[in-house]
Amino acid sequence: MATNQSISIFSSASLAVEYVDSLLPENPLQEPFKNAWNYMLNNYTKFQIATWGSLIVHEALYFFFCLPGFLFQFIPYMKKYKIQKDKPETWENQWKCFKVLLFNHFCIQFPLICGTYYFTEYFSIPYDWETMPRWYIALARCFGCAVIEDTWHYFLHRLLHHKRIYKYIHKIHHEFQAPFGMEAEYAHPLETLILGTGFFIGIMLLCDHVILLWAWVTVRLIETIDVHSGYDIPLNPLHLIPFYAGSRHHDFHHMNFIGNYASTFTWWDRIFGTDAQYNAYNEKRKKAEKKTE
């Protein structure tokens, strides 16, 4: 009975979204995007698209999303939004981070990316324009991937903080007590594989078009770079997402090496009480801010 009701609610919601979508004006960028997509399909093999296309998407978007946070350090106005004001970014740390990123991206992640083509072939995932999902379907599936990844990340991240293994793997990610955007993927190669598995579980369960793979890469990069940015920007649109953790939530984890283990949402930390110290810190911070007003 409950299952039937859930299906009925889901179907009604889907119909409502489809109706709203039908009322929206035609996207002027759709035709150019369609032409570009078909040009890609006609001029490159599936292996080239899945391998080199995925690499380009990841590298271009990663450093593009890191750019605002990188520029903030040169803008005096943005300093008031920096969470750990007493720990500014240094060129030494950023250069060290960049070198490790290049190693991780091309020696660890790229070999995994090379398997994308075989993944899409094995699961018969299409590339063509005609089967590309509508925007709301892609958004819903990306949200599903985020929930799956967040769950995996919470429990495995918490395990990596166990005193018997922390110093061997996860300690590298905590070298910088005040995080910055580029540090999001600064990690031990084993951590890249362990926590990165959560990214692929969602893809294996929910991906039905290669564009969804790239969409999920985009969403995940936006999220992880944002929470590592070190800045709490008031008008950040990501704060509109229910239960979104955000930069201040994750910054506390880097500041104190404990609690707030989830990557995207707050519910697992809330359920298991691993946000208790953060909540106490946050209340104290808010009271201090009120006194200074």
UniProtKB/Swiss-Prot annotation:
Q: Which GO terms describe its cellular component?
A: endoplasmic reticulum membrane
Q: List UniProt keywords, sorted A-Z.
A: Cholesterol biosynthesis, Cholesterol metabolism, Endoplasmic reticulum, Iron, Lipid biosynthesis, Lipid metabolism, Membrane, NAD, Oxidoreductase, Steroid biosynthesis, Steroid metabolism, Sterol biosynthesis, Sterol metabolism, Transmembrane, Transmembrane helix, Ubl conjugation
The UniProt entry, under InterPro entries, shows: Fatty_acid_hydroxylase, Sterol_Desaturase_Related
Query: Pathway, per UniProt?
Result: Steroid biosynthesis; zymosterol biosynthesis; zymosterol from lanosterol: step 3/6; Steroid biosynthesis; cholesterol biosynthesis
Q: Name one GO molecular function term.
A: C-4 methylsterol oxidase activity
Identify the residue span(s) of motif Histidine box-1: 157-161
- Which residue pairs form cystines in this protein? none
Q: Which cofactors is this protein said to need?
A: Fe cation
Q: What does this protein do?
A: Catalyzes the three-step monooxygenation required for the demethylation of 4,4-dimethyl and 4alpha-methylsterols, which can be subsequently metabolized to cholesterol.
Entry remark concerning the domains of this protein:
The histidine box domains may contain the active site and/or be involved in metal ion binding.
This chain's protein is named: Methylsterol monooxygenase 1
What is the species of this protein?
Sus scrofa
